[in-house]
């Protein structure tokens, strides 16, 4: 629902449109996009072999980031570098967003940079390619 939900926080650009731009910026990366509002679907996706052994994983856990130990455990199984992205500055928002249970599992976290956080994450992963 990016582009429709709370545009004052998340912006007005649909993620699918931004994804096209990311694919243009990083043609050497095979960018695969998965989104679900269901915790179990996210866990099942992360546990797939092609994800666990991917070159890198960028995750925005949304509100799951603040309480889903199950997703954190699934991320621990991923052998690829993990980067967490949050579009908004979660530390400038509600108290419950001050805790992030996914961050300790990730190599890096990009918070509050808008959609550009995804570009920064992919640039980091791209720079590791030999």
Residue ranges: model-predicted function:
Residues 32-33, 83, 92-130:
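Short, glycine-/small-residue-rich phosphate/pyrophosphate-handling segment
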Residues 7-25:
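Short catalytic helix/loop segments, enriched in acidic residues and glycine
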Residues 26-32:
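A generic structural motif
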Residues 53-91:
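Mid-chain, well-packed structural core segment of small domains
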Residues 32-40:
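Short beta->alpha junction loops
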Residues 44-53:
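Short, well-structured alpha-helical segments in soluble
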